[in-house]
C-alpha cells in the first residue's frame, strides 16, 4: 500500500539536532563565521527540543544559511521559542503542520490533561505531555519488515507497500495481550532484563512461521477471506483471519501441550438482532457468554474476551454523524483503538484529541528481527515508537474495525453499559448495539452464510437495493 507521507523522525534513527552532530566547517573565515552561527542555532534547537521522546519534526532551519544582523537577534528568537515550547500550552505532532492546543487527549481509555496549568504536585493525576508520551511509547509498534523468510510458496520476503492492515491488526491484538498479562498501567522499562511475559508477547509477533501471530500465519489463516502475500485486505477480512488463526492455534496447543497461546475468547461482532443485513452490528451477551464457556472448555465461568467490531461508516468518506461516537469509544476503559486510516492506507489509531486521530504508523520499513521467547536481554527498540502522528477524523476511511478487551464479567458488564449509553446518544444511527439474546436459529458469531458474504469479505450483488446502491447512512458488513 502507498504509505502515509513520512515527515517524522524514526525513533530508531539518530537526529543530528538532538545528538549535536554538526557538519565540519571549511577553513575560510567567512565560512567559519557562518558555521559558528549554524552551531549556535543547532545548540539552541538541541536544548529546546532535546527530550526522551522525539515528538517534534526535525526541519532543516532555512535561516541557518542567512547571516543574522546580530547574535542578540538569535538569542531573542531562541528565548521566545523556548518560552512557547516549554510553557506546555502548545505542542506539535509529527505528520501534521498544525500546532495543536492543550486539549485533553484520550488514549486507549485514559485521559491525559495537557493544559498549561497542569501541576506536578498531584502525582496520581494523568497529566502532562511526558506522562502521555511515556504511555504512547510503551505501546507495541509493528511495522513493515524486510529480510524475513519467504511467505508460504511465494517469493515475498517483505511486506512493504501491502502489509499495513496486517501490521495494524497485530498492533491492536498485541495491546490486548499486554493489557491481559501486564495490565493497562504497564510501561516499557528503561533497563534490562525485561519482563519475560513482555518478551514472550513480542516473540509471538515475529516474522516466521514459528511465531504464533506472524504475518506468515495470519495470511495462511485468512486465505479463504482473500488474504495473500502482495495483496491488500480490508478490516472485516482481517478480523475473520484472526478468528481463524486463534481457533487453529488453540486446537494445536490443546493437542501438543494443553496450553493456550491466546489467553482469551475472541468475538468478531457482526449482524443485527434479527440476523438481517443493513442494521448496526450487535454485541449479543449470550453469544459472548457462550464463547467464554467454549474457551473454558464447557465451564460456566467467564473468561477474558477480545471484541472486534468491523464497520463501514459511509461510502467514499466517513459519515460525520459517526465521528463523535467513534471519539467516545476511546473513553471506554476497555478501548483497544481502531484499525483504520486514510483510504487504502491502514494505521493503528490509539487515541484522539479534538478532531484529530492519534496513531502508530506501520509504514516504516525495518529489518526483520528474531526475538526468542526466553531472551529477556533482547533489543526491543524496533517494537516501540516515540513519534506521535495525527490525522483528521473526517479523513478516516469509512471501512474500519474497533477493538475492546474485557478482563472479566464485571468489565464486560461495564462495557455493555457504556455501549448502551452510546446508543442513546446516536440519534438512531449507533455504531453498534447490545442485546441479551437472539433467536436460537441465528448464529451471530459465525454468520457469513446468513449475511450473504463471500469468503473474501465482499457483499453479494443481490444484497444491493433496487437502485443498485446501498444507503450512505446504513451499516454494512464488509
UniProtKB/Swiss-Prot annotation:
MF term (GO), any: protein-phosphatidylethanolamide deconjugating activity
Principal location listed in the UniProt entry: cytoplasm
Residue ranges of the region described as Disordered: 1-31
Residue positions of the active site: 164 (nucleophile), 361, 363
Class of the enzyme per the UniProt entry, highest EC level: hydrolase
UniProt-listed InterPro entries: Papain-like_cys_pep_sf, Peptidase_C54, Peptidase_C54_cat
Homology family: Belongs to the peptidase C54 family.
Subunit structure: Interacts with ATG8.
Name of the molecule in the record: Cysteine protease ATG4B
Organism of derivation: Oryza sativa subsp. japonica (Rice)
